[in-house]
Each structure stands twice: as structure tokens, then as C-alpha cells.
Amino acid sequence: MLTAFARAFRTPDLRKKLLFTLAIIVVYRVGTHIPIPGVDYKNVQQCVREASGNQGLFGLVNMFSGGALLQITIFALGIMPYITASIILQLLTVVIPRLEALKKEGQAGTAKITQYTRYLTVALAILQGTGLVATARSAPLFGRCSVGGQIVPDQSIFTTITMVICMTAGTCVVMWLGELITDRGIGNGMSILMFISIAATFPSALWAIKKQGTLAGGWIEFGTVIAVGLIMVALVVFVEQAQRRIPVQYAKRMIGRRSYGGTSTYIPLKVNQAGVIPVIFASSLLYIPALVAQFAGGNSGWKSWVEQNLTKGDHPIYIVTYFLLIVFFAFFYVAISFNPEEVADNMKKYGGFIPGIRAGRPTAEYLSYVLNRITWPGSLYLGLIALVPTMALVGFGASQNFPFGGTSILIIVGVGLETVKQIESQLQQRNYEGFLR
């Protein structure tokens, strides 16, 4: 692997792409440390230290921003608005016929959907930025903080608007940086930035576990977390690469004087066909009642119930609800992202068939049957991986700081494999051996 990486750097155009990607990553990481106007940065740092790694409802967004959310920087929202906008557009494509037609128009339709995604990203950034500023002003962003009311000293409307504009502009810059990587660098730009954002939180989280540990100065807990993380990475790589291959044969066709077809191929159905989307959906849905309860006044019974049962990661109700939501969204997302009838129609149109299965409706029913069977273990795997921080480290009392959570590991492994395969394909075009043998 190291030899292949060295060969990639020795290839002029690949080296240029890799260096360009690294330069964009440096710019992105610098932006995550530039505070927005109107924030008392010293008080923010004090609140972050007092939070002791427990970031409450904002932990997921803080992870996707590379720790910039709790620092209240110009990149505080990170790529979360873009991720949310992409998911919403993907869901609306199934519901709205106009968007579905655009999706089938090829490159022109994809460009139009990308434009809609950008517009929705800006709108979501304004909403999320306004919510973040309001939360920072009232201080529940950090939980209990001794200087909470002094995070935003000037609470005028002008200051609030300025902060929201800065964070929205920061989101637009992040989106632009991601597109630059996609066009001129290596890999998918937004995926690379997501990878860097998550990886950037690992060192501080690992060191916090070491500092909070009690066995051998915290080194036993530290080593245990590293070991669990490596095992999880190996498990996720194994499952993410696993797939059920449905054999497909194409009949020979005579067009003019030439014969076409007669080849054999397969349809790869991954065990984890839904990817990390169900985990993000479940996390977002669980945050809604907790977020409403956090800003609701009074001490009503439902607010107390939500705070006791849906905000604590080690509570049985939270664990069961989270697990069931992940399983449900896994089936839901697979159902809207993979259309067996469309695949069967395309196969029939081009003379393809599955051996032993008639073309048309029987093929669609067979694909649905196989997909449902492999989605069950895939959804259970997602649920168990997502609950590892709670189940594995609750004994150490450090589950809030556990960096190798389900969402982070799934994204890092997925993006890593995708990027390595892209570099490998470019190396193979130049007759070099790749990373994966």
C-alpha cells in the first residue's frame, strides 16, 4: 500500500491532485478555528473546558463540523446543512415527479438538482445559524457554564444578524471547497471534508478518555478504546465490502451484421445497502423532542420524561428507541433508493435476465426478496455499531467521549474505501498496482 501511495505521488497529475486536496483540507481546518464577530472567544474556551466532552444534543453536528460548532467559528455549521439538504432532495425525488424526471435526464438534470441542493443548503444554514446564535446567547449550548451569559456580550439585532450571515457564508465556502476537491482533487469533496471533520475530533476525545481514566493513570482505558476502535474498523471494513452478487446474462443480439451481447455480469447488492443514512436519520429524529424540551419553559411532565429517557445515551428506553429507528430507516431508505421494478425493466430492455428467473415482474419480485433478506442483517449490524459507545464503555464512564462511534466509523471507513478505490483506478490506468490486491 505504501509503495502504491509513493507511485501515486511520483505520477505528476496524481501528485497535483493529491497536493491540491491537501491544500483545501488545510484551508478548511484553518477556517474551523476562526471565531465569528460578536463572540467572546475566551469565555467560549472556558465553557468548552467545563463541558468536559459532554456536548448534549449538539454532539452530532459538532462532530460533522470538526469541533467548530462548540467553538462558534465561521465554519461552525460545517457540512451539516449540505448533508441535510442532500438527504431532503433525495427523499423528495421519490415523491415529486418533476424531480424524478430531472434525475433521469442525465448530466443536465443532475446539475439542476445540485443547484436546488445549494439553494436549500443556504436556507438551512440560515435557520441553523439563527438557532445556534439563539442557543449560544441563552447558554444551553454548553450545558451549565459559569460564564454562559457572557458568550455573546452584545445581544443586539445587528450583532445577531452579523453572526448568522458569517456562519451562512462559512457554510457556502465549505460547500465551494468540497466542490473544488470533487472537480480538481481526489475523491468526493464533501465526503473528504466529512472524513477530516470527524478525524479531527479523535485526538482530543482520546486524550479526554485518558485524563478521565483511573486505571494506571488512564492508560488502560486509553489502550482499551484504541483496541475496540481497531476491531470496529476491521468489522466495518469487512461488512461494507460484503455483497450478494446476483448473476445476470445477456442474450446475443444481431444489429446489422454484428453480434452484440452474450456476456455475463452481476448485480452487486451490499449487505449495508443503506450506508450511514439510517443512523443520521435516527439521531436527528431523536434530537427533535429533546431539543423542544430543552427550550420549553416550565416543568411539565412530558418535558421531565423526555429529559430522563431520551437525552441519556445509557437509558434503556433511549437504547431501544434508537435501535428500532435505525432498523426502520434502513428498510425505508433501501426501499426508496433501490427500485427492483426499474432494474428489472432495464434488464428486460437490454436483453438481460437472471438464470432461472423469468424477465419482467418475476425478476423484480426476486430482487425484492433477496434485498429484504440481506437488509435484515444489515440493519441489525447498523444498530449494533451505532450503540457501541454506550454498550462498550459505559463501565468506564466515558461513553460521551468515545470517538469510535457508529456514525463516525461508518463514514470514515466508507469514505476511506471510496477514495482508495479511486486512487487505485487511476493507478491502474497507468499500469501501476493499486492499494487493494
From Swiss-Prot:
Subcellular location(s) of the protein: Cell membrane
Sorted alphabetically, the Gene Ontology BP terms of this entry are: intracellular protein transmembrane transport; protein targeting; protein transport by the Sec complex
- Does this entry carry the keyword Nucleus? no
Task: Kindly list the residue ranges recorded as spanning the membrane.
Answer: 19-39, 69-89, 122-142, 157-177, 189-209, 219-239, 276-296, 316-336, 378-398, 400-420
Gene Ontology cellular component annotations, sorted alphabetically? plasma membrane
A Pfam family that this protein carries is SecY
Q: Which InterPro entries match?
A: SecY, SecY/SEC61-alpha, SecY_CS, SecY_dom_sf
Name the SUPFAM superfamilies on file.
Preprotein translocase SecY subunit
Primary location recorded for the protein, binned into one broad class: membrane
Q: Which UniProt keywords apply?
A: Cell membrane, Membrane, Protein transport, Translocation, Transmembrane, Transmembrane helix, Transport
For membrane topology, the record states: Multi-pass membrane protein
Looking up PANTHER family in the UniProt record yields:
SECY/SEC61-ALPHA FAMILY MEMBER
Query: What's this protein's function?
Result: The central subunit of the protein translocation channel SecYEG. Consists of two halves formed by TMs 1-5 and 6-10. These two domains form a lateral gate at the front which open onto the bilayer between TMs 2 and 7, and are clamped together by SecE at the back. The channel is closed by both a pore ring composed of hydrophobic SecY resides and a short helix (helix 2A) on the extracellular side of the membrane which forms a plug. The plug probably moves laterally to allow the channel to open. The ring and the pore may move independently.
What does the record note on quaternary structure? Answer: Component of the Sec protein translocase complex. Heterotrimer consisting of SecY, SecE and SecG subunits. The heterotrimers can form oligomers, although 1 heterotrimer is thought to be able to translocate proteins. Interacts with the ribosome. Interacts with SecDF, and other proteins may be involved. Interacts with SecA.
Q: What protein family is recorded?
A: Belongs to the SecY/SEC61-alpha family.
Q: Per its record, how is this protein called by name?
A: Protein translocase subunit SecY
